[in-house]
């Protein structure tokens, strides 16, 4: 991760600092939402979960070397003083805001190509292939495991460093608007849509709504960007009408095929 001060983090997420007397002197060099991964210099994200609350692990994170905590409330130590923290209304949204700022800082240093991938199937395999391809050209960051949502995408961004040239982002969605949110976060230069299938069709209200959601990626691209579309999938092929970007296509045959 690029080093960033507590003061700049608080500004990026519109948060309130507590327990940090000199925020300009506190430097964060990594971010995690897993207290077991904390190392000296870490920002620990106290994310509330379905079965446990990350705020419970703030003392453990601090003991392991966390220099700052992203929280939704102050957590007090044994003396009654707050652990160093940035307090926000929603830590997940704050992660997204911080990731957006990190991408801006990376691009201010040198050209960084952000490549985003979505599709009902094949995302993880494709991002692994892209990691290998781009990695042969220059320093490349890609998601760990299937980090593709509102938590996983920021965590991927946070692993980028000053020398990163390619940032590969996997994007998943369970609702319309999810991919638009992620694209607003990282501003991809290249967006690849692999296919539109029936996974999560019930949550979306039908396959056509899945196509609408996946197409948010190409809608987010600028005229200077590139959309990469599966020409064998009729719903993906139709997305060329939804983007201002240059369109490249791939496929196995001359005729589009319904999924």
What are these regions (language model features)?
Residues 76-77, 148, 198, 255:
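Positions that flank functional sites
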């Amino acid at each position: 991760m690029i080093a960033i001060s507590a003061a700049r983090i608080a500004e990026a997420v519109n948060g309130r600092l507590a327990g940090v007397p000199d925020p300009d002197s506190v430097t964060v060099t990594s971010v995690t939402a897993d207290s077991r991964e904390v190392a000296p210099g870490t920002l620990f994200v106290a994310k509330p979960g379905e079965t446990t609350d990350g705020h419970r692990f703030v003392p453990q994170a601090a003991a392991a070397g966390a220099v700052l905590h992203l929280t939704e409330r102050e957590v007090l130590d044994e003396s009654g003083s707050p652990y160093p923290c940035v307090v926000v209304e929603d830590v997940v949204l704050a992660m997204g805001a911080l990731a957006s700022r990190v991408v801006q800082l990376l691009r201010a240093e040198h050209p960084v190509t952000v490549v985003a991938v979505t599709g009902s199937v094949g995302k993880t395999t494709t991002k692994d292939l892209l990691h290998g391809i781009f990695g042969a050209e220059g320093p490349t960051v890609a998601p760990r495991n299937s980090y593709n949502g509102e938590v996983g995408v920021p965590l991927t961004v946070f692993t980028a460093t000053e020398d990163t040239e390619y940032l590969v982002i996997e994007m998943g969605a369970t609702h319309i608007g999810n991919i638009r949110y992620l694209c607003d976060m990282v501003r991809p230069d290249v967006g690849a849509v692999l296919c539109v299938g029936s996974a999560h069709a019930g949550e979306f209200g039908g396959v056509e709504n899945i196509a609408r959601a996946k197409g948010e990626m190409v809608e987010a691209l600028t005229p200077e960007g590139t959309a990469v579309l599966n020409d064998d999938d009729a719903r993906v092929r139709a997305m060329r009408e939804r983007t201002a970007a240059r369109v490249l296509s791939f496929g196995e045959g001359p005729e589009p095929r319904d999924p």
